[in-house]
Amino acid sequence: LYFHPKKRQIRDYYRYLPSFYNGTEIGAWLDEAWRTNTDNIRHINWDQLYDINRNQPENSLYGSGRRAINMIEERHTDQLDWNFYTQFSHQLRNNSKINGGMNLRRNRTEYYSEVKDLLGGDYWVDVDKFAERDMGGLNPVPYQNDMDYYQQYGHARAAKEGDKYSYDYYGNNLTARAWAMYETSFKGIGINLGGEVGHSTLWRHGLWKKGLFLDNSQGDSQKLNYLTYKLKANFNYKFSAAHSIDASIIYMQDAPAFQAAFVSPRTRNSVTPGISAEKVFGVDASYNLRIGDIKARVSGYYTKFMDQTKVLSYYDDVESTFSNFAMSGIDKRHFGLEVAASIPLYQGLSLNGAISWGQFTYDSNPDYVQIQDNSGEIKNQGKVYWKNFRVESTPQTAMNIGLSYRSRKNLYASVDLNYYNNMYLSMSPLYRTDAVLSRNMTEEDIRELRHQEKFDPACVLNASIGKNWYINRIYTLGFSLEVKNLLNNQDIKTGGYEQVRLLKNKDENYQTYQPFDSKYFYMFGTTYYMNIYFRF
């Protein structure tokens, strides 16, 4: 939903929420209205959006009809992918062989936005609304999304439903890789050794010339070239039919993702400062037990991610501008243990369980550069202090216990209880920089600002049942029914993030900043899945 900046319809906009008016009568009224959904306050007022568009004045500059100031857009990521792949395998001895191959890939992804629904309007004027607001309307050039169209017709495009608007560019990726793997086994020992070497080239090709960046938006960007490689080894040993161990190690370097390689790919060709190839080092080891139908596995792992890059775009209340926040040198460290077992109880009934414990933390204080989106000017740079904070949005402790049943007549059923803990909120990097500190902040104020929220532990009960019928040993008819969250617990937080924005608080002598309220994702209530299938 795209709306006029001064007529926001997003219901969780901070000025529509009770927390913005804490301690006032309107705050108390809003709190009650949100709890009871008075006047559908939780929902978008679609009738109002249509009425606003239908009541806009006509403007002959853009033809007949009324200009929409609210509409629904559809963001496209249209891929065109060419792949060439070849491989070979050669038997060296009875128990040894070598495999190898080569892969060539050319990917061109077109990113653009399309006018999907004008909500009662007749056309959409294709200009950068935020640049128009920030720079005023005296000089129309800076807020043109397509300068070639503007120079030809003397005004911005009047986009109709189905037309492209706002941005249109290609993301290009050219990759060549060659790999080889050696496998051998003897006396219960298995060894795999493998390697890969390659090269990746990334570049942006702008299809439109933006008014804000006349010389840096259309055509090819700088081409980013990366050497890529991968080295890995795997070892396994069977003591007996019941006992075995395996271990593996890997080190690799890969090109960054296209969207992380450019500061603002929708508007210009500028490369993210500090961008580099990403590295991964990992080791893991497991012990496996199998005695009859009893199965168990114990595993440990350690993984280090290095030199990752991330770009955020947001409105910065400190600098009063829309910004791109580019971080480089992000390191993460994951390590943990996993235990799983399956024990038969009686005639098709089994007890299953698993325990997973991990510690996933940031292992560096990344460098950041904050760039004003409308000008490309660097507003701030420094360090993000989040070393030893937890990686977000995944439970780092989890347990599962359940019963499963499978009969000889192809009937199967299961029920399981899942427990999750040590799950953390996604952090705002801005809160952990020196840019938001003021002279009158105490150490306690800083700790509170930079504290990372941990979610409450949660339990979820699930169940499923299904059956297959075989017809003439050729066809299969079957069904399955799965019910998730049987206890209908809708208070479980599954993720969320700190907003990057800050509220300014001023007194006679100082200015301080208050974080916006965090946003959360919650688990659905009881959910049912029914699947009927026929295989032939």
Indicate where each model-derived feature is located:
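C-terminal beta-barrel architecture of Gram-negative outer-membrane proteins
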Residues: E392-N472, G495-G496
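Gram-negative outer-membrane beta-barrel transporters
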Residues: Y302-K304, F325-Y431, Y533
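Outer-membrane beta-barrel transmembrane strands
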Residues: L1-K6, A68-S113, K160-G190, L224-T228, ...
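C-terminal beta-signal and adjacent terminal beta-strands/loops
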Residues: L351, Y419-S438, K467-F536
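Transmembrane beta-strands of outer-membrane beta-barrel pores
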Residues: F3-P5, L104-E110, F186-G188, V197-W203, ...
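Signature of Gram-negative outer-membrane beta-barrel scaffolds
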Residues: I69-M71, K97-S240, D367
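Surface-exposed extracellular loop regions of Gram-negative outer-membrane beta-barrel proteins
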Residues: L1-F20, I26, D31, R42-Q91, D146-A158, T201-L212, K223, Y237-V283, ...
